[in-house]
Design a protein with these regions (language model features):
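Ser/Thr/Pro-rich, intrinsically disordered low-complexity segments
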Residues: 219-225
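Short, low-complexity, Pro/Ser/Thr/Gly-rich segments in the mature regions of secreted, periplasmic
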Residues: 227-238
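Short helix C-cap/helix-to-loop transition motifs enriched in small/turn-promoting residues
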Residues: 2-3, 76
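Eukaryotic N-terminal intrinsically disordered, low-complexity segments enriched in Ser/Pro
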Residues: 168, 187-188, 192-203, 207-215, ...
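Low-complexity segments
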Residues: 21-189
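Bacterial N-terminal signal peptides
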Residues: 3-14
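Sec/Tat signal peptide C-region and signal peptidase I cleavage site
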Residues: 15-20
């Protein structure tokens, strides 16, 4: 019991340091169709070409060997390190990943991915018991935040608008201790100004907003040359 409490404490302490806001290339114009995974408190998106799930009040995406979470269907997305991914997300059977990575090949479709084999012994030691549970006492799936269907396209809220809307229209409180920590961290960050977050407003939604865009090739050089000619003419007039 004591060992389990120590592991849980380590997980909670690492959640905040694991969270970072990123753009993952998912750009949904409408609320996705979400279907329950039989026997699990999880939903998946059968029509999406993405490993897109919903569990305990948050959306979860597995992409590029990384887990991401968000309280809104189109992000922004926050990194969840392997050490702080909820166990029922880790337990989702391989067959419900719509874009399974290459290393899933050969694994049973009705069983969870072999995360210990993939992430190594150190991870497996920290997350011991993740793949063992009483299937007769699985919690019920959380209700979907279907109010978000009315927020699509240009109506999709900015980060600072999301938490107030969510808290007003979605009364469900996460049961999972780790999810509650993720949820609190995301809510706290959304309450900050862009300057306080340090995100420069560039990573709000999907792939249409890039963290950095370089000017067209030659444009910066042309501007520098133009400024140089203007300065030279000014010096000639002052002589």
């Amino acid at each position: 019991m004591r060992a389990a409490l120590i592991v849980l404490w380590m997980l909670l302490c690492s959640v905040s340091s694991a969270v970072a806001q990123v753009s993952i290339g998912i750009n949904l114009s409408l609320y996705p169709e979400l279907v329950p995974v039989p026997g699990y408190p999880v939903y998946y998106a059968p029509r999406m070409e993405a490993n897109y799930f919903f569990y305990d009040g948050l959306y979860w995406v597995y992409q590029g060997d990384t887990w991401y979470s968000s309280s809104w269907y189109n992000g922004p997305w926050w990194i969840a390190r392997p050490e702080v991914v909820p166990v029922f997300v880790l337990r989702i059977p391989v067959g419900y990943y719509r874009r399974p990575p290459v290393y899933f090949r050969g694994w049973r479709s009705d069983a969870p991915p072999r995360w210990g084999e993939h992430w190594g012994r150190d991870w497996e030691r920290r997350r011991t018991g993740w793949d063992k549970w009483n299937r007769s006492s699985v919690p019920k799936p959380a209700p979907l935040p279907v109010y978000q269907r009315q927020y699509s396209g240009d109506r999709y809220p900015r980060l600072e608008q999301q938490h107030p809307l969510h808290s007003q229209q979605y009364r469900y409180q996460p049961r999972d201790t780790v999810v509650r920590q993720h949820y609190r961290e995301q809510a706290a960050r959304s309450a900050r100004t862009p300057a306080q977050r340090g995100d420069q407003g560039a990573l709000q939604q999907g792939s249409d907003r890039q963290p950095h865009q370089e000017p067209p090739r030659g444009q910066g050089q042309g501007q520098e040359k133009g400024r140089g000619r203007d300065e030279e003419r000014g010096r000639e007039r002052n002589r």
